[in-house]
Amino acid sequence: MLIIPAIDLKDGHCVRLKQGLMEDATVFSEDPGAMARHWVDQGGKRLHLVDLNGAFAGKPVNEGAIKAIVKAVGNDIPIQLGGGIRDLDTIERYLDDGISYVIVGTAAVKSPGFLHEACYAFPGQIMVGLDAKDGKVAVDGWSKLTGHDVIDLAKKFEDYGVEAVVYTDIGRDGMLTGVNIEATVALAQALTIPVIASGGVTNLDDVRRLAEVESEGIIGAITGRAIYEGTLNFTEAQALADELSQI
């Protein structure tokens, strides 16, 4: 199971939000490229980037910072990116820039046809980001709750050729309250496509609990605030996940 460091970008800086609230941002670094390189040097096998401004604006905003990260990382590890991706031109531009996987969130919920087109145009490189609160999907940078049940919606996307589902529990994101194992496992069990867990991964116990259910289809866990504030040592977390994967 991959432990995936998150780099959330706001106004060109690396930040973390609590429950997706832009006004509750903590700046962790003003040099996104250096931060990305740090996680590679610590043994990271993949990076998770989010253009937070883009998620709210509905178009790319932090492209400069994203290019700096790609340049710093080079071809060392894959990078997945979400936030503000609403058209095929944006996807193509990011992939040309060196991003490995593009995460379609709001646009997948509002325009399933667009998601289908994206999967057809860029096979193996499109993920779906489903962000949920109490089992209901949120859109537009988490600012609006829909009536869609997260499992029902994810199952509709299975035949599209989606590479993975990035599932975020909004209520736990950035709160250091522990991962929602039950909801994550329920989603993974309902799908044939892999799930990457996000939101609330706080300590080694969370990593252990997720790694123990990896066989249900959970291929990774994204962590942000915990590795920046020190409640989780990234290198230890990946080592534990690797160890449990071999049992």
Curated annotation (Swiss-Prot):
GO terms for molecular function: 1-(5-phosphoribosyl)-5-[(5-phosphoribosylamino)methylideneamino]imidazole-4-carboxamide isomerase activity. Pathway: Amino-acid biosynthesis; L-histidine biosynthesis; L-histidine from 5-phospho-alpha-D-ribose 1-diphosphate: step 4/9. It comes from the Bacteria. Its EC number is 5.3.1.16. InterPro entries: Aldolase_TIM, His_biosynth, HisA_bact_arch, Isoase_HisA-like, Isoase_HisA-like_bact, RibuloseP-bd_barrel. Keywords: Amino-acid biosynthesis, Cytoplasm, Histidine biosynthesis, Isomerase. The keyword Isomerase applies. The active site is at D8 (proton acceptor), D131 (proton donor). Its main location: cytoplasm. It catalyses: 1-(5-phospho-beta-D-ribosyl)-5-[(5-phospho-beta-D-ribosylamino)methylideneamino]imidazole-4-carboxamide = 5-[(5-phospho-1-deoxy-D-ribulos-1-ylimino)methylamino]-1-(5-phospho-beta-D-ribosyl)imidazole-4-carboxamide. GO terms for biological process: L-histidine biosynthetic process; L-tryptophan biosynthetic process. GO terms for cellular component: cytoplasm. Belongs to the HisA/HisF family. HAMAP family: HisA (MF_01014). PANTHER family: 1-(5-PHOSPHORIBOSYL)-5-[(5-PHOSPHORIBOSYLAMINO)METHYLIDENEAMINO] IMIDAZOLE-4-CARBOXAMIDE ISOMERASE. This is 1-(5-phosphoribosyl)-5-[(5-phosphoribosylamino)methylideneamino] imidazole-4-carboxamide isomerase.
